[in-house]
Amino acid sequence: MKRVIVVGGGYAGTALSRALDGVADVQLVEARDRFVHNVAAIRGVVDPSLLDRILIPYGRLLRRGRVRQGTVTGVSARGITLADGEQIEGDIVVVATGSRYASPFKPQGDATQAFADELRAVHAHLESMDTIAIVGGGAVGVELAGEISTAYPGKAVTLVAGSSSLMPGYSGKLAEALAAQLRGKGVSLRLNTRVDTLASRDRPFVGSLGTSLGEAGTPLVFPALGARPVTAIFQQIPGVGLDRQGRVVLDAWLRPAGVRNLFALGDAAATGDPMTIVAITRQVPWLSKTLTAMLAGRPLASLPPYRPWPMRGILVPLGPRDGASVLPVLRNGVQVGKWATALLKGRELFVPRYLKEFGYDRAAQ
């Protein structure tokens, strides 16, 4: 049986590994001891009890393949190199190293216990503060404003964004729907407002953003300035380039620099999709089908190239019952409101789904 090595145990890497588990000898390599369902970490800021269900062991993910804990320092079309110098050979290598984000929305290192401890500490700090400022008008900042204002309606929440509307890169209609709901929850929106100096860009802090913002007291500040692709592992490959977002440039079949039998997907890869779970639902089925055909002897050039979603889809809950979303269907997408957003994501944040995919029922032990 052909050997497939997947580097990175996030959403893309685990989904692809599961999809190929029955047709290849799959080895998934990940530095962390548990899968971090970081989509739910935003609500974890107001409800840290979620931690019992969003830090999920890898042991039950694959039936035939293997999940190995280790740090990958080198990749090629023939295999990978681990930090201890061990080399693992493979017939196909897929890199899905994902992206980084400020704490407490993603781990800052490989220790999942440290991530859990920090999220609990941030929650305790949040409960003690009356004034909250969120810097960043993208999905994380918008969702966080919705979660805090829903769970703590008595707190003063201000969302600061340098853009003229929320959710840059998406439709004005979506931005308007989310802005109206946030204002209805009492959130103050400060658009077209740049914050040039932050005490930290990587974790929450207590400090002023400037008197011009009119903060009533010194706020707890959450930086939510966007994801940063993790691409260092590609830099040793000759000819590999990065796009303006820092994502690895790929050919039509998701190969960096056209390297034979080396593929990339997810947040680190310039696929033409945004860095969202919605994007993964298109990339993984395509790559799984493509690699299955290759493993059966089909030449890659005879297979259809990857095509990103024609419309940027995204699900943006504002707490368990509110929010708005764009579904990547039809030519221009379909925008849906509170009920559909709650049903698709807001109520459960995919927690039961990922527990089930990893072999658990209600909690990960």
Language-model regions: role of each:
Residues 2-3, 63-133, 211, 222:
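FAD-binding core/adjacent interface of flavoenzyme oxidoreductases
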Residues 65-76, 80-81, 88, 154-252, ...:
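A Rossmann-like FAD-binding core segment of flavoenzymes
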Residues 125-155:
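Rossmann-like NAD(P)H-binding beta-loop-alpha module
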